[in-house]
Design a protein with these regions (language model features):
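C-terminal subdomain of alpha/beta-hydrolase-fold enzymes, centered on the catalytic histidine
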Residues: 278, 282-450
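Alpha/beta-hydrolase
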Residues: 179, 188-329
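Catalytic-loop region of hydrolases
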Residues: 22-124, 434-435, 440-450
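Conserved alpha/beta-hydrolase
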Residues: 121-141
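Alpha/beta-hydrolase fold nucleophile elbow
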Residues: 170-180
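Alpha/beta-hydrolase active-site loop
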Residues: 148-169
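C-terminal motif of bacterial Sec signal peptides marking the signal peptidase cleavage site
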Residues: 16-19
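Bacterial N-terminal signal peptides that target proteins for export
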Residues: 1-9
Length: 450
């Protein structure tokens, strides 16, 4: 009841402020202190801090924003048990105007600043509200270590609560958006709360439906890049798998042990080897860059060992570990094409069914048995076809995650395929997104947001 009363108060308070704001895309800097005042008046936000993203302070005029803040919002650990355990969730706000559109950036990981979806928000001259995912960054809850409530349903309820708290303040239209797992989070939010947003957008977001999703292997080995770069990629993998557990793997274990790190199982080594090449395509926009990197790995043993040691997953890295937990519970995991190298894996201890367990701590190995694909299967087979909330799904051809794009969409969802670029939501860089693709994205978004 307290939250409802405060929200009504804020609605009345903001009404007067918004009446003085502009109808065009320009920012009226006379309102510079108003947002903090309104946020403090709600009593819903804690530890409000100015200018959390120092990287954009000098670009304030260029980015055309008034203020930026970080703060914390009190959430229920279990939204089905209101009044039980609570945790503080970090929220970032880039403010451009009370009557401007608002982009709710549905962070799938920890919040590092106003980075994801910044081009889209800038082009819209929209506010950005970034919500850090539960059990990432500074938003850990009492469920940590039990993981019972680390689900897409609970994360969607987090977003719904933040939206309800801020909607009386930001009066323009709202959309949610994110890249990669953050985009998955947007679609899941629209799935659970289809009436909240005018549009949900996902950039480069995969929708895996098993712990061994085999759609990825053929796409990575046969579709991305050029034949030359794919041949180099396969040669690098073959070299790293030569002699099985007595080859590069043995050297990697020796080096990691000498550095005081835990030696990986052979299964974990194989997963990370494939993931290394996966990332080469994911983040390098040009085939020339990929060829240079893979040639270096192939020709320089020391460089190869360094690459391999650097990418072995550390189970003690908190934020990444939360991701593996979510994969084990609902998100699923890619199979990057182990069958293409069966001749080198035969007779080794590699077991594709042990990939997820190798990424989890021993005390959490039970999570694999809890895997449930119900939500994502329903999203792909039903929600994408019948969604009442308009959707936009943006993919890049050479991004391996595109392998897990939705197989079909209904009339209220739009697919945009970028033939160039990388695993990113960049719209304003011509090297990553052509003017035609950029315009297609903006035309579709503006149809719902203006």
């Amino acid at each position: 009841m307290k939250k409802i009363v405060l929200k009504l108060y804020v609605l009345l308070l903001v009404a007067g402020i918004v009446a003085c704001s502009n109808d065009d895309n320009t920012v009226d800097n006379s309102q510079n202190s108003e947002l903090r005042t309104v946020l403090e008046q709600t009593g819903l936000f804690y530890d409000i801090t100015e200018n959390p993203d120092t990287s954009i302070i000098k670009r304030k005029a260029e980015l055309n924003y008034k203020e930026q803040y970080s703060m914390f919002y009190k959430q229920d650990t279990n939204h089905d048990d209101v009044g039980g355990d609570e945790f503080m969730q970090r929220v970032g706000i880039l403010f451009r105007g009370f009557d401007r559109p608002t982009v709710l950036v549905t962070e799938g990981y920890n919040w590092r600043g106003f980075l994801d979806i910044k081009d889209l928000a800038t082009n819209l001259n929209a506010n950005m509200v970034c919500v850090e995912h539960r059990n990432y960054g500074m938003s850990y809850n009492q469920d940590k270590g039990k993981w019972e409530y680390q689900t897409v349903a609970q994360a969607s309820a987090d977003l719904h609560a933040v939206y309800q708290a801020l909607k009386p303040i930001f009066k323009g239209k709202w959309m949610c958006a994110g890249t990669s797992k953050s985009g998955e989070t947007s679609i899941c939010y629209a799935y659970y709360y289809p009436q909240d947003m005018q549009l949900a957008a996902a950039f480069c977001s995969p929708f895996a439906i098993s712990l061994d999703d085999e759609r990825f292997g053929p796409y990575l080995m046969e579709e991305v890049g050029t034949e030359e770069s794919r041949s180099l990629m396969k040669a690098v993998i073959r070299r790293a798998l030569e002699n099985g557990e007595n080859g590069y793997y043995k050297d990697v274990c020796r080096l990691m042990k000498s550095d005081g790190k835990e030696e990986p199982t052979f299964t974990k080594y194989v997963f990370n080897l494939f993931d290394l090449l996966f990332q080469v395509y994911q983040y390098m926009p040009s085939d020339e860059e990929r060829i240079v990197k893979m040639t270096t790995m192939q020709d320089d043993k020391d460089a190869m060992l360094k690459y391999l040691c650097d990418i072995i997953v550390d189970n003690d890295e908190e934020d990444l570990y939360s991701y593996w937990v979510e994969c084990a519970k609902e998100l699923g995991l890619q199979n990057d094409g182990y069958a293409y190298f069966a001749d080198l894996l035969e007779g080794t201890s590699f077991d594709k069914d042990m990939v997820i367990p190798s990424l989890l701590k021993a005390e959490d190995s039970w999570l694999v048995e809890s895997y449930d694909s119900t939500v994502f299967t329903d999203i792909l087979n039903n929600f994408m076809m019948t969604t009442p909330c308009p959707l936009m799904l943006y993919y890049v051809h050479n991004d391996p995650w595109t392998a897990a794009m939705p197989p079909k969409l209904g009339p209220n969802a739009k697919l945009i395929m970028n033939p160039v670029g990388k695993h990113h939501s960049a719209l304003n860089d011509p090297a990553l997104c052509s003017p035609a693709i950029r315009q297609e994205v903006m035309d579709y978004v503006q149809k719902y947001i203006y």
